C-alpha cells in the first residue's frame, strides 16, 4: 500500500506534474497550468514544436524534453533519475489531458513505483467536454480512445461491446468515420450517436441523430478535424429478452481474455443483462 500526501510530505525527490493543455482554444489554459510549467525544471512534451508554440504564447522559458510513444520506454529511466535527484517535471500532451491516448501512463506508473509524488492538474479533456453537451446519458460512460483501423478487428470489438449499457466514447479520424459508423450500424443497430468535431474551435460542431441519419448527412458533407464519437448504450429492456439465447459464461470469458479480472467480468455481464450476479458467479465457477 502507498499513501501520497501531495503537498505535505517533505521529500528529496521531485514531483511529476500532469498538466493539461488546451484542446483548441488557448483561453482554456489555466493560471495554475501556466505557473506550474514555469516552475518545474523540465517539460516532457509529446511534440516539442507544438508545445513550443504554447510556451511562447505564455512566456514560458522552461526547457523541454521530447517524450512520445516512440521513445517512451527509452526515456522513462532517465526521467525517473531526474525526479529522484530532486528535479520536478511536467508532462504535457499535444492537447488535453496527459495519459489519455498518449504514453504518460507508463511514466506515471514508473514514478509511483519509485515512490515519487504524481500530481494531476484539472483542465481540458475532449471526451468529458463533448459528453456533457452531447445530450446522451453522462453516466455511466466508458472511453475507449482510438479504434482499430482494421475492419475485422473493429467489428469484433463492436460485437463484444454491443450489449454494454454504458454510453461509449471513441476518437476517430474524419477519413475513417463513415466506415466506422457503417461497422457500428451492423453490430449495434441504429442507435443514437453524437459526432463532435473541432471541439472548442471556431467551427465546433455537434451532429446528433441515429447512426443512419449521421451516415446520410456525411454523404453530402465533408469532415475536417479530429472527431469524437459518442454512442448511446444498449437498451436494457431489449437486451433482457435476449438473455435466454445468450451464453453469458462465454461473455464473461471474453471479458477475462480482454484483461478483466473474473469478478469484474462477472459484474459487468450481470449488469449488462440484468441477471443475478451471484447466480452468474456460480454458473461460471461450476464449469
UniProtKB/Swiss-Prot annotation:
GO terms for cellular component: cytoplasm. InterPro entries: 4pyrrol_Mease (IPR000878), 4pyrrol_Methylase_sf (IPR035996), 4pyrrole_Mease_sub1 (IPR014777), 4pyrrole_Mease_sub2 (IPR014776), rRNA_ssu_MeTfrase_I (IPR008189), SAM_MeTrfase_RsmI_CS (IPR018063). Keywords: Cytoplasm, Methyltransferase, rRNA processing, S-adenosyl-L-methionine, Transferase. It comes from the Bacteria. It is found in: Cytoplasm. Belongs to the methyltransferase superfamily. RsmI family. NCBIfam families: 16S rRNA (cytidine(1402)-2'-O)-methyltransferase. This is Ribosomal RNA small subunit methyltransferase I. It comes from Streptococcus pyogenes serotype M18 (strain MGAS8232). The lineage of its organism: Bacteria, Bacillati, Bacillota, Bacilli, Lactobacillales.
Amino acid at each position: 500500500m502507498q499513501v501520497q500526501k501531495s503537498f505535505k510530505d517533505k521529500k528529496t525527490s521531485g514531483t511529476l506534474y500532469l498538466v493539461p493543455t488546451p484542446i483548441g482554444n488557448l483561453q482554456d489554459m489555466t493560471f495554475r497550468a501556466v505557473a506550474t510549467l514555469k516552475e518545474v525544471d523540465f517539460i516532457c512534451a509529446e511534440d516539442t514544436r507544438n508545445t513550443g508554440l504554447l510556451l511562447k504564447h505564455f512566456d514560458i522559458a522552461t526547457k523541454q524534453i521530447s517524450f512520445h510513444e516512440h521513445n517512451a520506454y527509452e526515456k522513462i529511466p532517465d526521467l525517473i533519475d531526474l525526479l529522484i535527484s530532486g528535479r520536478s517535471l511536467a508532462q504535457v500532451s499535444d492537447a488535453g489531458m496527459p495519459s489519455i491516448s498518449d504514453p504518460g501512463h507508463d511514466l506515471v506508473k514508473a514514478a509511483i513505483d519509485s515512490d515519487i509524488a504524481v500530481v494531476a492538474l484539472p483542465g481540458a479533456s475532449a471526451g468529458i467536454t463533448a459528453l456533457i453537451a452531447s445530450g446522451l446519458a453522462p453516466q455511466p460512460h466508458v472511453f475507449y480512445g482510438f479504434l482499430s483501423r482494421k475492419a475485422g478487428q473493429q467489428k469484433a470489438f463492436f460485437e463484444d461491446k454491443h450489449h454494454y449499457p454504458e454510453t461509449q466514447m471513441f476518437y476517430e479520424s474524419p477519413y475513417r468515420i463513415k466506415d466506422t459508423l457503417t461497422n457500428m450500424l451492423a453490430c449495434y443497430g441504429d442507435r443514437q450517436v453524437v459526432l463532435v468535431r473541432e471541439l472548442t474551435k471556431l467551427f465546433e460542431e455537434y451532429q446528433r441523430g441515429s447512426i443512419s441519419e449521421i451516415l446520410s448527412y456525411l454523404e453530402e458533407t465533408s469532415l475536417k478535424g479530429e472527431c469524437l464519437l459518442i454512442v448511446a448504450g444498449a437498451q436494457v429492456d431489449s437486451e433482457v429478452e435476449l438473455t435466454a439465447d445468450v451464453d453469458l459464461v462465454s461473455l464473461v470469458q471474453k471479458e477475462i481474455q480482454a484483461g478483466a479480472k473474473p469478478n469484474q467480468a462477472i459484474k459487468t455481464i450481470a449488469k449488462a443483462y440484468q441477471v443475478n450476479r451471484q447466480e452468474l458467479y456460480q454458473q461460471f465457477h461450476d464449469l
